[in-house]
Curated annotation (Swiss-Prot):
Source organism of the structure: Citrobacter koseri (strain ATCC BAA-895 / CDC 4225-83 / SGSC4696)
GO cellular component terms, semicolon-separated: periplasmic side of cell outer membrane
Biased segments, Pro residues type: 36-50
Protein name: Penicillin-binding protein activator LpoB
Spans annotated as Disordered: 26-71
Biological process per Gene Ontology, one example term: regulation of cell shape
Signal sequence extent: 1-19
Cell location: Cell outer membrane
Keywords recorded for this protein, A-Z: Cell outer membrane, Cell shape, Lipoprotein, Membrane, Palmitate, Peptidoglycan synthesis, Signal
Highest taxon, organism lineage: Bacteria
Summary of the function given for this chain in its UniProt record: Regulator of peptidoglycan synthesis that is essential for the function of penicillin-binding protein 1B (PBP1b).
Lipidation (N-palmitoyl cysteine): C20
Similarity-based family: Belongs to the LpoB family.
Amino acid sequence: MMKMNRYALVAALAIFLSGCVGQREPAPVDEVKPAPEQPAEPQQPVPVVPSVPTIPQQPGPIEHEDQTAQPAPRVRHYDWNSAMQPMVGKMLQADGVTAGNVLLVDSVNNRTNGSLNAGEATETLRNALANNGKFTLVSAQQLAMAKQQLGLSPQDSLGTRSKAIGIARNVGAQYVLYSSAAGNVNAPSLQMQLMLVQTGEIIWSGKGAVQQQ
């Protein structure tokens, strides 16, 4: 009898438990909601850098030859010797010329209307008087030193007769030969004057034409 009651109790307990299981509400299931879509940020417009136009290369300044350039001066050559030799011969035979004295030959002074090589003329004159038999010439070195004392270069003419006489006295000369080329530079005339240093007197003068070579 007791064993049957035990079975009945077990059966009743099983029924009770099954009822409880049937009445249990299911656990709430959280509904997975999709995440709200974020609105897409508007894209910032990419700034467009305007292209810099290519600047055409400017041509350099056009160089023109200087039209105002002066032409090189013409180099003239003269036959000084043909003009000087006859004049020197006459001077050595002039009255008042005493042999054995010292002669200062000044540089030929250019008084023409153009440019000429006065140094060449002076050298030719000194050569024409070399070994003349009457005068001893003041050396070119002595004359250059005397000119430097006046602030002149050896090639410079003394310019005036008074300066020439003053230099002649300083170097111990008794005579001075003053020469100049004058007139048209294309056909100059050569003038010579032989002066006595002591008095400044012109004891001989001559003039001759000079031809170009």
